[in-house]
Every structure is written in structure tokens, then in C-alpha cells.
Amino acid sequence: MTNVTDQQLELIKKSIQFVPNYPKKGILFRDITELLKNPQAYSASITLLAYYYRNHKLTKVVGIEARGFLFSAPLALILKLGFIPARKSGRLPRDTIREPYILEYDNGFLEIHTDSITPGDQVLIIDDLLATGGTIAAAVKLIRRLGGEVNHAGFIIDLENLGGKSLLKEIGINSYSLVTFSNH
């Protein structure tokens, strides 16, 4: 890596704050709002993801509600790809398909519009954070059910000790994260 890239990654890492016992006791939450507030850190996060995925043969970017939208939509614009929101149940206005997910502190359903992915689409999934991999696994199932091909997922943060990267590897997804934290 270049010094510029190392400096950008350090800026990103330093802009992520730790909030204990949020949203429930025992969870050490990674807060990205400081990253978003800092235009250099926010821009660096999008730029580095765009650089990494620039030569992948992609047609769409699926962003995971809600914080994933903050990175996936600008990334889709830079890469000149379509953007597809994957939302929690009941928040999309037209026909959808849905898939259950189970997280460290939440569960529910993830949905996408039935006409958002077409057979043969090469799809990249983007979210702010990889923890257990439950939400991404649900998104992968949705994309594949609609005939899309998905082999990649990108993140700002990987919480490596929660096993998300291993889960994604088991279902054929290569994951890439800008920063990694090993403590929970």
C-alpha cells in the first residue's frame, strides 16, 4: 500500500467511535457518524472502495439498510452502476421478495423489489459493517433467487471475531473491508 492509502485507512479507523452497551447490554457498537461528519474520512472510504472494485465486472450495487446506503449509493455513482436498496420488511412500495435474517441483536426480514435484479446481473453488496454475516447472507439469497450473480461484498468495518467473513466464504462471497477490529 502507498503512504496515501495507509494515511486514509488510519483516518477512517480513527473516525470510528466505540459505544459500549448499545443498542443493548453487552454490545460494543461501532459508530460511523464521526466518519460521516469528516469529509476527508467519508470521501476516503468511498474512494478506496471504488478503487478496489473498479475492475470487477459489475452491473449493480445492492446497499443494505440503513447505514449501508451511505456508502453503496455514492459508490454505485462513481462506478456508474445501478443502485438497489435492500430494506427491512414493509419499506419498499412495489412487489418484493423477502428473506429472514438473524443478527447479533436483531432479526427480521430483508426485501428487494422483484424487478430490481435481472438474470445475469453481476452484483456487489455493500454495508457499513460485517459482524455475523446474517444480513449479507439474506441479501445473497434474494439476489440469487432473482437470477443475479453475487460473489462480492464490501464493508467499511469487519468485526473479525464474530465470524461473518467465514460465513460469507461458505456461501461463495469474497469479502473486502477497509478496517478490521478484533475485539467485540
Curated annotation (Swiss-Prot):
InterPro entries hit by this protein: Ade_phspho_trans (IPR005764), PRibTrfase_dom (IPR000836), PRTase-like (IPR029057), UPRTase/APRTase (IPR050054)
S-S pairs: none
GO cellular component: cytoplasm
Pathway assigned to this chain's UniProt record: Purine metabolism; AMP biosynthesis via salvage pathway; AMP from adenine: step 1/1
Entry EC number(s): 2.4.2.7
PROSITE patterns attached to this UniProt entry: PUR_PYR_PR_TRANSFER
GO MF terms, alphabetically ordered: adenine binding; adenine phosphoribosyltransferase activity; AMP binding
Pfam families: Pribosyltran
Catalysed reactions listed for this entry: AMP + diphosphate = 5-phospho-alpha-D-ribose 1-diphosphate + adenine
Compartment(s): Cytoplasm
CDD domains xref list: PRTases_typeI
SUPFAM superfamilies xrefs: PRTase-like
Keywords, comma-separated and alphabetical: Cytoplasm, Glycosyltransferase, Purine salvage, Transferase
Example of a GO biological process term: purine ribonucleoside salvage
Functional note: Catalyzes a salvage reaction resulting in the formation of AMP, that is energically less costly than de novo synthesis.
Subunit composition and interactions: Homodimer.
Recorded family membership: Belongs to the purine/pyrimidine phosphoribosyltransferase family.
Protein name, per record: Adenine phosphoribosyltransferase
